[in-house]
Amino acid sequence: MEYRNLGASGLRVPVLSFGAGTFGGKGPLFGAWGNTDAEEARRLVDICLEAGVNLFDTADVYSAGASEEVLGQAIRGRRDAVLISTKTALPMGEGPQDWGTSRARLIRATEQALRRLGTDYIDLLQLHAFDASTPIEEVLATLDGLIASGKIRYIGVSNFAGWELMKSLAVAERHGHPRYVAHQVYYSLAGRDYEWELMPLGADQGVGALVWSPLAWGRLTGKIRRGEPLPAASRLHETAQYGPPVDDEKLYDIVEVLDAIATEIGKTVPQIAINWLLGRPTVSSVFIGARNEEQLRQNLGAVGWSLSKEQIERLDAVSAATAPYPYFPYRRQEGFARLNPPIV
């Protein structure tokens, strides 16, 4: 397994990490994702550790805390061998302190997560969303205190806009608070919006990308193709409305190129889609999920080999999107590109 520094931090993480969204299985969304219990979760953790995957990601909102509980049971007795990443901010109830990133909420949410996980520290705590109702200074001062207390070690964010992340980094620098080292983002061959602003920001500021849904919410599994009905067992029947938007015709074009490359090199469509991401700038780790051992072992096969330059160019071309303003002049006009050439 290859390991990379998480952004500009000294924390080294595997290029593949395990997303525990399938653990617990409560509610319409997470129930459709999977219902992995503690016994099965422990087997999946065993497989991950054997392969060198030691970072496990969850969130308090996943199955109303059950995902954290199951993960905690699955890693019991081997805490020193794993890195735990969890997230908070989204609503866990209807009370005034059940959502957001206020001082009261962050302290309580961290303590609750520690209890559910059965540990006394969290390696990486991420804000699941930007809370516009809480001053950034309050958020960062609280996180600074949690780091000083030993309850968390590194901090990151998820699903932030560029200005939200940049302002947070500036406030941290101004007041001497720890900086965010990771941004958990949606990024896939079927969704490359991350590249317009968040990727250059991450490269400039040393914020590593942790990629969620590398298979485009289950659309790049190799089971969805042009002219064929959605498989009866696909979770997209229940979860499509929760996921990122996808242009179906473009998706089919991407899958056709993935199919062709899969035939050429003897790899699967998901393995190729994940491997492509590992070659993109700023990507520290890609989160893979699995409802069973077979899915996990297949996804683990995405590392240990490389796509050719020609294959990467084909995937780049078929998945390319039209850049929105103000990004398109830098990709279409030499004068603009000379001043600020795109990263990809």
Residue ranges and their predicted role:
Residues 1-82:
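N-terminal binding-site loop/beta-alpha segment at the start of enzyme catalytic domains
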Residues 27, 33, 93-197:
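Glycine/proline-rich, positively charged
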